[in-house]
Amino acid sequence: MNNPVDWKAFEYKFSGDPRAAFESLAYILFCYEFKQTYGIFRYYNQPYIETQPANTADGHKVGFQAKYYDAGTQMSSKEQDLKDAIKGAKNKYAGIDRIIFYINKEFSASSAKDKDKPEHQLRIEKYGKNLGIEIQWRGQSHIEKMLAMEELKYVKNLYFNVETGIDHFHESLINHKNSILKHI
């Protein structure tokens, strides 16, 4: 059975530093999505994006940023922060043409009848487009869909399962295998 992603469990499990845990989760999902099997080089305090940009199979140079916001944070209040990250990445990383923002929240739909996206989201995307950077979003629904895939089940358990049984079982299985192989 594939249990749903429980964001409250994530908050509980990583209550000491949920932002760092979310950055780690976003890194794993980004590497998976763009087939970066061995990870992506990064610097300590990497500016504007989480790692060096990745070259994709379809010819793009993509960077990502993870943004973990507490429940009281309005996405509209983060517009300038996101624009600053876009501008900084454009200036720092030659050739970058796409930035993916992993966010633990969903945008609120526009209150206008003829629009789905809120104005602040449209302004952020337009700002990126004017700099030659496509902006993509990976919100809760995207993350939950990715973590529903069988091959990412271990990631979901690592970040969203407060029971330590699976982690201990996996560790004991590896130790058992190593002890057997050690004597061969």
Which ranges hold each PLM region?
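Mixed-charge (Asp/Glu-Lys/Arg
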Residues: 1-184
